[in-house]
From Swiss-Prot:
SUPFAM superfamilies: Protein kinase-like (PK-like) (SSF56112). ATP binds at V10, G11, E12, G13, S14, Y15, G16, M17, V18, K33. InterPro entries: CDK (IPR050108), Kinase-like_dom_sf (IPR011009), Prot_kinase_dom (IPR000719), Protein_kinase_ATP_BS (IPR017441), Ser/Thr_kinase_AS (IPR008271). This is Cyclin-dependent kinase-like 2. GO terms for cellular component: centrosome; cytoplasm; nucleoplasm. It comes from Macaca fascicularis. The gene is CDKL2. The keyword Protein biosynthesis does not apply. One of its GO terms (molecular function) is protein serine kinase activity. A motif ([NKR]KIAxRE) lies at residues 45-51. It holds the Pfam family Pkinase. The [NKR]KIAxRE motif seems to be a cyclin-binding region. Keywords: ATP-binding, Cytoplasm, Kinase, Nucleotide-binding, Nucleus, Serine/threonine-protein kinase, Transferase.
Amino acid sequence: MEKYENLGLVGEGSYGMVVKCRNKDTGRIVAIKKFLESDDDKMVKKIAMREIKLLKQLRHENLVNLLEVCKKKKRWYLVFEFVDHTILDDLELFPNGLDYQVVQKYLFQIINGIGFCHSHNIIHRDIKPENILVSQSGVVKLCDFGFARTLAAPGEVYTDYVATRWYRAPELLVGDVKYGKAVDVWAIGCLVTEMFMGEPLFPGDSDIDQLYHIMMCLGNLIPRHQELFYKNPVFAGVRLPEIKEREPLERRYPKLSEVVIDLAKKCLHIDPDKRPFCSELLHHDFFQMDGFAERFSQELQLKVQKDARNISLSKKSQNRKKEKEKDDSLGEERKTLVVQDTNADPKIKDCKLFKIKGSKIDGEKAEKGNRASNASCLHDSRTSHIKIVPSTSLKDCSNVSVDHTRNPGVAIPPLMHNLSAVAPGINSGMGTATLPIQSYRVDEKTKKCSIPFVKPNRHSPSGIYNINVTTLVSSEKSLFRASKKRREYSRTDVHLPELNYNHLPELRALEGTARNSRLTKKESKILSESRIPSLAAIDLHTPSITLHQVSGPPLSDDSGADLPQMEHQH
């Protein structure tokens, strides 16, 4: 029963209660009848088992549909389709009675449903307005089969029968234990006048008072019932009332038509053996006039189909609602994850972004790289102001499909942005800024913050990299302008850090050639002072220039900035 959500109490009786519930899985609204603890009360258990047994074998458009049966903690639970409207509700809304056409449709379906039960040798025994449900489409459904039972075999007697007094047949009131389908027909006769007039036909306060109302309208009981009355110990010392003047139905309800009075009289015949069967009632003139029975039978089928569609649409609507709620919850979870990711450590976040972007096509990476290259950052310090020009990634440069001759703007790999490495990394003989190169995969997460000092304008003889001389000159001027003192140092004392060309074999070979050239010149001439040449005068239009050719006589600096001198202790 955990799959049902309680929506409120519908009704309560001496044997249990009925609650309105919603199925959490399908969203269908149901009515659950919860009996009292049946293991402690044999009567409750008997009523529950009887209703379960009968409703399992009764399936009809005018009978309430039993959906499920379960037992939990000594209690029986019966799950029915939910119909929240009854004929009693109509009578309370219209105390002066219902319209003729409405009563005609209701009675046709009531008799049809009871006739189906009788055809299966089952009598309801508790027909009354509150036990007759009406759906939104106008389909009538009989409910509450707690007092229903199969017909007794010959010689068998009925026991434990307690029904609503106002609708009890005379044979039930006097205690006859051999009754049959006629008790339901009597109840139908009581409903006929009540639905038309809005008031109960025989509103007795007790069993003897009920007999009095019946005898006032219909006359004396049959001899057999009178005998049973005087033998019944319940009526010991009580005599049947003497009726001096009767009040028949036509006098009591003069506004009712003759056909309605005739239908009621047939159902309310004082002798149960003379009451008609339900099949005979359906052929009464009340239903056959103007072809109502045939016409309404077709209309009833459409109403039943409409109710079935409404149930199906309700299920689909609930399923769509659940799917939407599920999608909304997933969306909220995604939003939560995004918020958590933005609050995470920047390095971890960038790493995650890198993994995601790595699976995309090269065109997207190139587009993002171009957008990133349009940004610039400004590094401020006490001694220098350097404008950093972002570069594209090494991965883009290492692409062999790139024509470096036609695309001189291809960027060099990202460089470390430790400015202290600039001074020892400048070679007067090489004319290049050599900084330790880190792994591309490590620097990828910080490539947006890389600080390249040079921008390629022409590729080197190796066909891989080129240095933008103009950018280097402006950087040199900014660095040298900050220094005020000149210090002397020997060219032999200058030790350049070795580049780690793990993934650039051609540059490593080029570095060896440059070293040999520098050692040869060292033997012939020792310079006591060395200036880092300005590259402003180098012919930028000579594509065959090599790195060792950059070394030579110092070029004059247009700005007149002095070179910094450093003392090296060994």
